[in-house]
Amino acid sequence: MKCPYCSAPDSRVVNSRPSDDGASIRRRRECLRCNRRFTTYERAQLEPLMVLKRGGQREAFNPDKLLRGLILATEKRPVDPEQLRAFAYGFEDEVQASEITSEEIGRRAMTFLRPLDDVAYIRFASVYRDFDSLERFIEEIQGLKGRGED
């Protein structure tokens, strides 16, 4: 490992231990030239979850983008922001695939929001399903009411 102080190419590991609940390894190193110590972290690099968009393009999954949509849907609603954050940042771990459609992300987000708050659910659904008329809102609300009576 290259020394950050003198750029020497060689160092020795003085101490090594798990970090971040075992998700990475913290190593204390000592430069063999200048004898200064520095810390490095080693983490497995996984292939990113790819999102297949409606237009056919592909992009890496971004939990911040999902979180923004959830926050907008739940704005001024009695929903714990930590629940939203946990869902968005845990989403990639829950998906057992290398690729997912944006439609599936939307479906899963709606499934997550439904028991939390009806208004947030409708807000998210209106964007995800691209409601273009008042009738679409009414249909969705009636569907919610029908499921609530089961």
UniProtKB/Swiss-Prot annotation:
Coiled coil: none annotated. One of its GO terms (molecular function) is DNA binding. GO terms for biological process: negative regulation of DNA-templated transcription. Pfam families: ATP-cone (PF03477), Zn_ribbon_NrdR (PF22811). Its cofactor is Zn(2+). Residues 1-22 are annotated as: Disordered. Binds 1 zinc ion. It comes from the Bacteria. Residues 49-136 form the ATP-cone domain. A zinc finger (unnamed) spans 3-34. Keywords: ATP-binding, DNA-binding, Metal-binding, Nucleotide-binding, Repressor, Transcription, Transcription regulation, Zinc, Zinc-finger. The keyword Transferase does not apply. PROSITE patterns: ATP_CONE. NCBIfam families: transcriptional regulator NrdR. Belongs to the NrdR family. PANTHER family: TRANSCRIPTIONAL REPRESSOR NRDR. Negatively regulates transcription of bacterial ribonucleotide reductase nrd genes and operons by binding to NrdR-boxes. This is Transcriptional repressor NrdR. The gene is nrdR.
